[in-house]
Structure formats: structure tokens, C-alpha cells
Amino acid sequence: MKSERFRTELITNVSHDIKTPLTSIINYVDLLKADNLSEEEKAQYLDVLDRQSGKLKKLIENLIEASKASTGNLTVCPEPCNLNILQAQTAGEFTDKLTQAGLELILRKQQSTPMIDPNVDNADLPDLVITADSRHLWRIFDNLMGNICKYSQPGTRVYIDLATVDQCAQITFRNTSQYPLEQSTDALLERFVRGDSSRSTQGNGLGLSIAKNLAELMNGTLALHVDGDLFKVIVTFPLAIEEEYN
């Protein structure tokens, strides 16, 4: 019953996002049929077609992945995954997008003990290793960072924090939203709304849902915390047993 409701809401909530790039593609194909176009105009129209077809392709991929993830119909290949390396790789991958969005990314490695200030990075702490599917784990990071780049207030700092809590690795993504966050966290995860009631921003709201389902497929959890315009996503996985990766 839940998976059936998921599919129904999935189709309903993203239908507008499918129509937008599709309509644009149809319109620009018609424009290209004109006989009196200059080479510059043709190049501009082709550029729009390239961008819109890319958006449509990405949306279809997200729809397929969201459906598979919600039903557990995805292959999981567990292996040791170093979160410190992934944290650094994420910073590198998103350098350009963060710069374009006017955001500063802060990476921190923390340990939840009274002996260490959780607000101070400690390079001597051991790396955090979990057992997960590296492809799905990257997709979680990619989706969450994509949301951060789209919806954060320009000129603010965003954070990816690593911490150990009760034999678990905890990854916290934190940012300041440029849109009101009035919806409940359940609504943000279950109904694919984006945090703003309008549809003036890009995206289809599937990223959080996909990330949550992927985390759960790998024995992890994903939780949201909203405090005014402050938005946190906390992803938690059991730490790998040392024998598994040594």
C-alpha cells in the first residue's frame, strides 16, 4: 500500500517538472524549422535544446531511481567506504557550483566526546569507515549537495561535518535556506515538496527522498532538522568493523 501511494504521489508531484522541459524542447524544435534563421540563432536554440534535454534526462533517471529505491529494488554491493575521502572528493566535485552559488563550504571532522571541542577540527582523529555501496553513497552526497547549491542563501557558509556517535558514523549537511521552511520534515521527505510553496526554483524535490531510501537500503538512516531558515540533514551509518577493511 505504501509503495502504491509512493508511485501515485511521485507521478502527481513531478508531472509539472516533466512538462516544462518537454514543452521547451517542442517549441525550440519548431523554431529551428524556420528558413530565415542565422547561424547564431541556430546555435542559441541548439544550446537551449541541449540544456532542456539534459534536464529531462536527469528527471527521468531520478524517477526511475526513486521508484526502485522506495521498493528496495536496487542492487547493493557492500564494501569499505572512507567517509573522510568522500568528504574531500565532494568538496572538489562541487567547487564550481558552490562558487557560482556564492557559498563557502566548510569541512569538519569531529568526535563526540567531552574531551574534544566538537566545533574544532582535529586532524589526528582516525578516518571514519563504513560498509556501504560506494555508488549509492555517492548518490546520497551528490543529491544533498545539489540541494544545498540550489536552495542556500547566497553569501553563507555550508557545512559537511563528520562525527562518531555511539559506534556510528554521522554525516551532517548544514545550510541556511533562502526560502521559508514551513513544511514538516515528514512532508519534505514523503511528498517531494522542495521547502518553498512556489515552483519558481529548479528541481523536482526527489533528491531528499532518494537519499533517504538509499541510506535505509544500506542499514543507515536519514533525518531532517529545521530551525527557522537553518536546515540540517543527518545521515547515520554503523561504523565498519576494523577486520572488514584491514
What do these predicted ranges mean?
Residues R51-L56:
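Short alpha-helical segment of the dimerization/phosphotransfer core of two-component systems
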Residues T71-P78, D117-P118, L125-A132:
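Conserved micro-motifs of the catalytic ATP-binding
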Residues K97-P126:
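Short conserved segments within the C-terminal catalytic ATPase subdomain
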Residues Q110, G155-Q167:
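Short beta-strand/loop element within the Bergerat-fold HATPase_c
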Residues I148-C149:
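Short helix-loop "hinge" at the ATP-lid/N-box region of the Bergerat-fold HATPase_c
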Residues P180-V193:
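Short conserved segment of the HATPase_c
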